[in-house]
Amino acid sequence: MPDKDEITHDAQSENEESLPLARPEGQFMKSIALDTPNSPEVFSIMKNPPEVDVQCNIDSRAIDERNGVYEVVLDLKTEARIKDKDSPDETRVAFVCKLKYCGVFTIKNLTQEQLRQTLLVEAPTLLFPFARRIIATATTDAGFPPLMLAPINFAQKYAESQRD
């Protein structure tokens, strides 16, 4: 006959297996590219901080759906433009930085809506500070001041996408 501790442990294990789970397993840089198409001339005409355009896309895919393993890709593209000192109405590209920063997550026992929110809100929120640091370091290494991206409200972006 099993003792009381074995019965309690089995019930606890079954209960834990049915609880919602969203756990990061790892994160990595899938790709990075930084282009400075107008260097070195751009450094001599740069008097003010550049105008920066940031594009952010999120992609996710099941790696092992049966075991709840998913990859989330934070795809960032930044383009910095500076005003040409000879033609103030014209701008020149200072740099373009493209980064795909990824995380692998184990996600179990969630509804489809909770899974979507985890993949499109919670996971990118966790990944963004690391991607931000990589972009700041890359732009510094390219000879520019560090580009510190403003935080992104992924919950708001998700809510807006649901209204469309």
From Swiss-Prot:
Quote the subcellular location field of this record.
Answer: Cytoplasm
MF GO annotations: unfolded protein binding
- The name on file for this protein is Protein-export protein SecB
Species source reads: Neorickettsia sennetsu (strain ATCC VR-367 / Miyayama)
Q: Give the record's family classification.
A: Belongs to the SecB family.
Q: Where is the composition biased (Basic and acidic residues)?
A: 1-12
Tree of life domain: Bacteria
Provide the assembly information.
Homotetramer, a dimer of dimers. One homotetramer interacts with 1 SecA dimer.
What does this protein's UniProt record list under function? Answer: One of the proteins required for the normal export of preproteins out of the cell cytoplasm. It is a molecular chaperone that binds to a subset of precursor proteins, maintaining them in a translocation-competent state. It also specifically binds to its receptor SecA.
Give a GO cellular-component term. cytoplasm
Q: What ranges does the record give for the region Disordered, renumbered to this chain?
A: 1-22
Q: Keyword annotations for this protein?
A: Chaperone, Cytoplasm, Protein transport, Translocation, Transport
Source lineage:
Bacteria, Pseudomonadati, Pseudomonadota, Alphaproteobacteria, Rickettsiales
The answer to whether keyword Zinc applies is no
